[in-house]
Amino acid sequence: MRTHGLTLLSLLLLAVPMLLVEAKKEGRNRRGSKASADESLALGKPGKEPRSQPTNYPIKGKFVTPDHADCRWAVTKQEEGIVLKVECTQRDNTFSCFFTGNPTSCLELHKNNAYWKQIGRNLRSQKVICGDAKSVLKTRVCRKKFPESNLKLVNSTLIRIKKPSQELMEPSPMDTVEVTTSSSPEKTQTMATKDPQCEEEDLKNQRKAALEYCGETWGSLCNFFLSMVQGSSC
């Protein structure tokens, strides 16, 4: 019995170190797998930057201006940038205008909804919609870093109607030159026609005075002196 118990004890003493070594190896493997998983997750997070969803065109909206014009707007995409068309009705008048810009770079980093909401607010706050040639639609999310995202007015039916009327009302400089040059020959002609009449009246007056003061005998001599002394009455 004693020999059997001693053999069992010796076997247990030999097995314990082996079990401890296996347990340490298994613990190391678990720690290594967990660390590698955490490292892969940690490396994967900063590599992916959050980006907004691509814009689905056309984008549409409606608004009412401070001067009670009912308007609607729609955005279409071009090869470079976008075009925003505004159509309004005020009483019996209808007018429209176009804005252009390129917010593509800004929309890749910011939310589309924020940008288009600010564009809609800017349209509603316009004092004279489609009537100011210097009108620019700006947004707080893009205008500092992306100035090309500002939408500028490029065409308007209101501004195009004003120009022809101004050109018709203003006379051209060629018209004024023709009037002045055509009137000058008439003046010279009237001046030239007045000279013979003036000379005939002077001669008649001189002859009358010579006959009254000098008589018929000395009339011709007096007439000669009077023509030298008296000037033309004209």
Curated annotation (Swiss-Prot):
InterPro entries: FGF1-bd. Disulfide bonds join 71-88, 97-130, 106-142, 198-234, 214-222. Residues 25-59, 169-200 are annotated as: Disordered. GO terms for cellular component: extracellular region; plasma membrane. Pfam families: FGF-BP1. Residues 194-234 are annotated as: Sufficient for interaction with FGF2 and FGF2-induced effects. Its main location: secreted. GO terms for molecular function: growth factor binding. Residues 1-23 form the signal peptide. Keywords: Cell membrane, Disulfide bond, Glycoprotein, Growth factor binding, Membrane, Secreted, Signal. Glycans are attached at residues 155, 172. It is found in: Secreted, Extracellular space; Cell membrane. One of its GO terms (biological process) is positive regulation of cell migration involved in sprouting angiogenesis. It is a peripheral membrane protein. Residues 178-192 have a biased composition (Polar residues). Found in a complex with FGFBP1, FGF1 and FGF2. Interacts with FGF1, FGF7, FGF10, FGF22 and HSPG2. Interacts with FGF2. Acts as a carrier protein that release fibroblast-binding factors (FGFs) from the extracellular matrix (EM) storage and thus enhance the mitogenic activity of FGFs. Enhances FGF2 signaling during tissue repair, angiogenesis and in tumor growth. Belongs to the fibroblast growth factor-binding protein family. This is Fibroblast growth factor-binding protein 1.
